[in-house]
Amino acid sequence: MTCLTLALDAMGGDFGPHVTVPASLQALASNPKLKLLLVGNPDTITSLLVNADPLLLERLQVIPAEHVIAGDAKPSQAIRASRGTSMRIALELVKNGDAAACVSAGNTGALMGLAKMMIKPLDGIERPALMTVIPNQQRSKTVVLDLGANVECDSTMLVQFAVMGSVMAEEVVGITNPRVALLNIGEEETKGLDNIREAAAVLKNTPTINYIGYLEGNDLLTGKTDVMVCDGFVGNVTLKTMEGVIRMFLSLLKSSGEGKKQSWWLKLIGRWLQKRVAKRFGHLNPDQYNGACLLGLRGIVIKSHGAANQRAFAVAIEQAVQAVQRQVPQRIAARLEAVLPKSD
């Protein structure tokens, strides 16, 4: 049986191997054709595998790494001192063809810089963007990018993000002629920073992009657009704010009806409502769409939330599997030359 092999930065994230190792076992249990290379401290990793199913361990290999890139390290310094780190070795496994994709919950800036340096961007792409696919109110999906890879973006980068997001929505999500919008502080054409207005001018005159104009942050989950484009600073703040509100909403649902002074029938009604609402809105749980693809590279790199729990990191692993199976870089590369506006 041919296995799909992924490299995991087992030491990255807020909880390191205490999350990545059990998440890896969960992913292996759910996918019999998956093999994982766990990069990190062998002693720490193996101590967490003592009670693991021996059959799962046959598809798991520990790759030693002496060092870890700290989550608060400056990207430039982290990249210079990256030799021997779990993140860099995981990326090297992809570069050398030993793994089909890399998954890391580590330092976003360092991951971006190392991936660009080692795996290289596709032709026509200046800088990769972090992209995720989130559910919306129309029971459909919305592609959102950039989510933090590039804090500052010029108009050219925003246009490139729009192209990549459009290709992703059509080729991978399966949306015909996807609508593309720029995230802005208003829908009027005069609103926004110069780079946003300049990008809008280009997208309006790009016939292969179904550009619909500006949308605001409160439109992110409405389904008004299939692709939402913004710079990494705005995207990161927007996504995390949205996730925080959703988590609060779900936690309030969970705690409702649990008061000690309530009668049994009120508690029963409360629990019934919880199940109904959870079924209706459970798909919005951020854990279910953890894992942002570093879009625009020649290989596949998935960035998990640093604070991801076991369930969420397992979802990020599954995101990597799907990206490999759907040949995301190849599909984007195949359409970039025809779609991307030519630069002077």
From Swiss-Prot:
Keyword Nucleotide-binding set for record: no
EC number(s) given by UniProt: 2.3.1.274
Signal peptide interval: none
Domain of life from the UniProt record: Bacteria
Known catalytic reactions: a fatty acyl-[ACP] + phosphate = an acyl phosphate + holo-[ACP]
Pfam families for the chain: FA_synthesis
Molecular-function GO terms, alphabetical: phosphate:acyl-[acyl carrier protein] acyltransferase activity
Pathway where it operates: Lipid metabolism; phospholipid metabolism
Record GO cellular component, one term: cytoplasm
Subcellular location as annotated: Cytoplasm
Main location: cytoplasm
Gene Ontology terms describing biological process: fatty acid biosynthetic process; phospholipid biosynthetic process
InterPro entries: FA_synthesis (IPR003664), Phospholipid_synth_PlsX-like (IPR012281)
Keywords: Cytoplasm, Lipid biosynthesis, Lipid metabolism, Phospholipid biosynthesis, Phospholipid metabolism, Transferase
PANTHER family: FATTY ACID/PHOSPHOLIPID SYNTHESIS PROTEIN PLSX (PTHR30100), PHOSPHATE ACYLTRANSFERASE (PTHR30100:SF1)
Assembly: Homodimer. Probably interacts with PlsY.
Cited function: Catalyzes the reversible formation of acyl-phosphate (acyl-PO(4)) from acyl-[acyl-carrier-protein] (acyl-ACP). This enzyme utilizes acyl-ACP as fatty acyl donor, but not acyl-CoA.
Similarity section: Belongs to the PlsX family.
Protein name in UniProt: Phosphate acyltransferase
Annotated organism of origin: Yersinia enterocolitica serotype O:8 / biotype 1B (strain NCTC 13174 / 8081)
Gene: plsX
